[in-house]
């Protein structure tokens, strides 16, 4: 049974996706236990439900790279801390290169990775084939030859919903409150400088607000008189049924293949059961829901439109 809505907290997080719940969890780790989160429908509905769960350690920024490394380390220890599996597949990640400029970028990254402490290898085509034996290395007019890659052995993919539930469990164990089916309908600034948040289940006053509403950021911003310049775009991905080649490889004792990324052709590929998920980063993806994301889209998909890829 859900607890009765508190009337006052130090921090109120709006939005129950992985970002909002992670914020709540980390507030408790900093000793801020008088905190709460409200979610208009159910946890993970929205951006988290639609996410592919990729965990790219690669980043040329020292600051962002540290954040990525911290996240991967957190996912490894969360199950022991909370008792909740996060479905973290440490399959590794291969970022392919088909041109010298891409290999130069990977060489430049070495300094950042070494400073942060991220394990990596800049590898040859032969090593790529060893790690990904189902791959054809190319070399035709239609398929550029692979000249090398950047390999992160600690990378992989995760189930965003499972991760959210683990963070939820950790936050609640530390004293945080979570209220689902509780939509923020209005915000008012009080004389004391605090925030009065009106919901369908009553009002709650907070010293601080954290807005983590993802696709709904524009709508939340309007309630505060803000124009949030964030509009969702339609992204297509392809889920392949069982692959005979992959099935034979895995049943023959092969380990889970690393997540593939190809920056020049702009796509990722990873295993999904005995099939594949292919996600092309299409150019000119159409904007959607500029006036607001409808209620029904929390766990829905766009119709297929592969012709524009």
Predicted regions and their residues:
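Glycine-rich FAD pyrophosphate-binding loop
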Residues: 28-49
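Dinucleotide-binding Rossmann-like beta1-alpha1 core, especially the glycine-rich loop
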Residues: 53-134, 264-269, 273-277, 287
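Helical element adjacent to the flavin cofactor pocket in flavoenzyme catalytic cores
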Residues: 150-208, 216
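Active-site lid/adjacent beta-loop-alpha segment flanking the redox-cofactor pocket in flavoenzymes
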Residues: 226-227, 243-309
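Conserved Rossmann-like nucleotide-cofactor binding loop
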Residues: 19, 43, 216
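Helix-loop-beta segment of a Rossmann-like dinucleotide-binding subdomain
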Residues: 6-8, 86-95, 109, 129-174, ...
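Beta1/beta-strand and adjacent pyrophosphate-binding region of the FAD-binding site
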Residues: 5-19, 36
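Central helical "cap/lid" subdomain
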Residues: 203-256
């Amino acid at each position: 049974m859900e607890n009765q809505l508190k009337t006052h907290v130090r921090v109120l997080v709006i939005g129950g996706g992985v970002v909002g719940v992670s914020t709540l969890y980390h507030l408790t780790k900093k000793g801020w236990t008088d905190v709460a989160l409200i979610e208009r429908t159910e946890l993970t509905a929205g951006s988290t439900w639609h996410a592919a769960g990729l965990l790219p350690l690669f980043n040329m920024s020292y600051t962002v790279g540290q954040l990525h490394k911290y996240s991967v380390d957190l996912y490894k220890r969360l199950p022991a801390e909370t008792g909740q599996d996060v479905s973290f597949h440490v399959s590794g990640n291969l970022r392919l290169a088909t041109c010298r400029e891409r290999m130069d970028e990977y060489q430049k990254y070495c300094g950042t990775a070494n400073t942060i402490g991220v394990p990596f290898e800049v590898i040859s085509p032969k090593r790529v084939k060893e790690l990904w034996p189902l791959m054809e290395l190319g070399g035709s007019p239609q398929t550029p030859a692979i000249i090398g890659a950047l390999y992160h052995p600690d990378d992989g993919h995760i189930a965003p919903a499972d991760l959210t539930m683990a963070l939820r469990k950790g936050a609640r164990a530390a004293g945080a409150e979570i209220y689902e089916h509780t939509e923020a309908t209005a915000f008012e600034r009080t004389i004391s400088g605090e925030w009065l948040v009106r919901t369908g289940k009553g009002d709650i006053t907070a010293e601080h607000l954290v807005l983590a509403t993802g696709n709904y950021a524009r709508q939340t911003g309007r309630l505060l008189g803000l124009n949030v310049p964030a509009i969702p775009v339609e992204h297509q991905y392809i889920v392949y049924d069982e692959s005979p080649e992959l099935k034979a490889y895995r049943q023959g004792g092969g380990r889970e293949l690393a997540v593939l990324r190809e920056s020049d052709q702009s796509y990722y590929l990873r295993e999904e059961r005995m099939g594949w998920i292919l996600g092309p980063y299409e150019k000119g993806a159409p904007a959607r829901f500029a006036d607001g994301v409808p209620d029904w889209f929390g766990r829905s998909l766009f119709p297929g439109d592969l012709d524009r890829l």
